[in-house]
Curated annotation (Swiss-Prot):
<dbReference type="GO" id="GO:0004089">
    <property type="term" value="F:carbonate dehydratase activity"/>
</dbReference>
<comment type="function">
    <text>Binds to chondroitin sulfate on the cell surface to provide virion attachment to target cell.</text>
</comment>
<keyword id="KW-0426">Late protein</keyword>
<dbReference type="InterPro" id="IPR036398">
    <property type="entry name" value="CA_dom_sf"/>
</dbReference>
<feature type="transmembrane region" description="Helical">
    <location>
        <begin position="276"/>
        <end position="294"/>
    </location>
</feature>
<keyword id="KW-0261">Viral envelope protein</keyword>
<dbReference type="GO" id="GO:0019031">
    <property type="term" value="C:viral envelope"/>
</dbReference>
<keyword id="KW-0472">Membrane</keyword>
<keyword id="KW-0945">Host-virus interaction</keyword>
<keyword id="KW-1133">Transmembrane helix</keyword>
<keyword id="KW-0812">Transmembrane</keyword>
<dbReference type="InterPro" id="IPR023561">
    <property type="entry name" value="Carbonic_anhydrase_a-class"/>
</dbReference>
<dbReference type="GO" id="GO:0046718">
    <property type="term" value="P:symbiont entry into host cell"/>
</dbReference>
<dbReference type="Pfam" id="PF00194">
    <property type="entry name" value="Carb_anhydrase"/>
</dbReference>
<dbReference type="InterPro" id="IPR001148">
    <property type="entry name" value="CA_dom"/>
</dbReference>
<dbReference type="GO" id="GO:0016020">
    <property type="term" value="C:membrane"/>
</dbReference>
<dbReference type="GO" id="GO:0019062">
    <property type="term" value="P:virion attachment to host cell"/>
</dbReference>
Length: 304
């Protein structure tokens, strides 16, 4: 068993840039969700088909299941942290080494048996139509220890973030039952608050009074990083960056949301006062450009 328990807080300035961490080949086009479960602690979706290869992997790792974690509030629900920044939630995609081991149960006994991909969820002003396909299934598993067929066409590729650079470290599964190599995508995917709140309506296992209660949160707090634990990064050296990927993404999301608001305002008032609407949208674009250039300049100054 690995001495490093998961999850952890990833300090980007201490991550080691590793040229051997090539881009992953993610083959989810043939993956198909079979069942969705409320385990009483989390939402689990079982898959048939789909696998990982390439990158640092010696062979193919078959997709087994997807787990979802969340918190009481939208700003605190992920297991892993990036520079002490917690996201709204987290998806874990569990894979096992089918070429080397005969079953998932056999694979979990070895430190090269499991690969877990982590995808962060970030609440924004817009619904994620692909994530909604999961949300739509939740009514069928409202009570604990229930399972139902996943009766919707669902393409897992659509839940991958826009950037696939990643952190890597050797830790454990979230319940500490086995070793696992973690692949953490620092770029999140956006979902709406209403979509995340639906998970808080699920019922957990009965408490000591014999009464079920809502799973309002199920994330785990991070464990201290051991002195000999090394976290690697697949991208360029990030120690020179002034902000963590999380904060940098937050700023870019803010700019994106600002533009979306501007376009909505433009569409709303274009018929009533076209001149005013055009002036407003030009002003916001100029402001966005200024803020973006300021952030880039500040980043270069800190790097030097």
């Amino acid at each position: 068993m690995s001495q490093q328990l998961s999850p952890i807080n990833i300090e980007t300035k201490k991550a080691i840039s590793n040229a051997r961490l090539k881009p992953l080949n993610i083959h989810y086009n043939e993956s198909k969700p079979t069942t969705i479960q409320n385990t009483g602690k989390l939402v689990r979706i079982n898959f048939k088909g789909g696998y990982l290869s390439g990158g640092f992997l010696p062979n193919e790792y078959v997709l087994s299941s997807l787990h979802i974690y969340w918190g009481k509030e939208d700003d605190y629900g992920s297991n892993h942290l990036i520079d002490v920044y917690k996201y709204s939630g987290e998806i874990n995609l569990v894979h096992w080494n089918k070429k080397k081991y005969s079953s998932y149960e056999e694979a979990k006994k070895h430190d090269d048996g499991l690969i877990i991909i982590s995808i962060f969820l970030q609440v924004s002003d817009h619904k994620n139509v692909y994530f909604q396909k999961i949300v739509n299934q939740l009514d069928s598993i409202r009570t604990a220890n229930t399972s139902a067929p996943f009766d919707s066409v669902f393409y897992l590729d659509n839940l991958l973030p826009s950037k696939l650079d990643y952190f890597k470290y050797l830790g454990t599964t979230i319940n500490h039952s086995a070793d696992a190599v973690w692949i953490i995508f620092p770029t999140p995917i956006n979902i709406h608050s209403d979509q995340l709140s639906k998970f808080r309506t699920l019922l957990s296992l009965s408490n000591h009074e014999g009464k079920p209660h809502y799973i309002t949160e199920n994330y785990r707090n991070p464990y201290k990083l051991n002195d000999d634990t090394e976290v690697y990064y697949s991208g360029e050296i990030i120690r020179a960056a002034t902000t963590s990927p999380a904060r940098e993404n937050y700023f870019m999301r803010w700019l994106s949301d600002l533009r979306e608001t501007c376009f909505s305002y433009y569409q709303k008032y274009i018929e009533g006062n076209k001149t005013f609407a055009i002036i407003a949208i030009v002003f916001v674009y100029i402001l966005t450009a200024i803020l973006f250039l300021m952030s880039r300049r500040y980043s270069r100054e800190k790097q030097n």
